[in-house]
A protein has these predicted regions:
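Conserved N-terminal Rossmann-fold NAD(P) cofactor-binding segment
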Residues: 35-84, 94-95, 99
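Redox-cofactor binding/interface segments in oxidoreductases and associated redox assembly factors
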Residues: 87-88, 116
Length: 133
């Protein structure tokens, strides 16, 4: 399976850094958060990462503009219905993550890969909130 578009749930520090890495690799990425303000803050954070690269001479302004064309925002999870991979990157709250995985299971295509950036919670427990293997 090829990954043509990625979704990241959570526009905090980890989510924005994941979105930056994905877009830097040349893959379109949708950064999803609960509201417009949070999602836009995430987009601004990705732009700031790229601007720091421009300031250091590691990329030029045209490259920054090209990379930012790959980054979009979604206010809620509905904007992730056509992605190939979703990476959940919200706070380490089992109830919240379980709810997100349940919703993603309903919204995303059957062949969409659902992944988590959790470092402390059981991935099996999160996966149990879906109807996927």
């Amino acid at each position: 399976m090829y990954i043509y578009k990625v979704g990241v749930v959570g526009a905090g520090t980890m989510g924005t850094q994941i979105a930056e890495v994905v877009s830097y690799a040349g893959v379109p990425v949708v950064l999803a958060d609960v509201n417009e303000v949070s999602a836009q803050r995430g987009i601004d954070a990705v732009r700031a990462i790229y601007q720091a690269r421009v300031a250091k001479g590691k990329m030029n302004p045209e490259q920054l503009a090209e990379k930012m064309l790959l980054v979009s925002a979604s206010y809620g999870l509905d904007g992730l219905k056509d992605v190939d991979l979703v990476i959940e990157a919200v706070s380490e709250d089992a109830k919240l993550k379980t709810q997100i995985f349940h919703e993603l299971d309903q919204i995303c295509r059957r062949d969409t890969i659902l992944a988590s950036n959790t470092s402390a919670l059981s991935i099996s427990a999160l996966g149990a909130a879906t109807t996927r293997p």
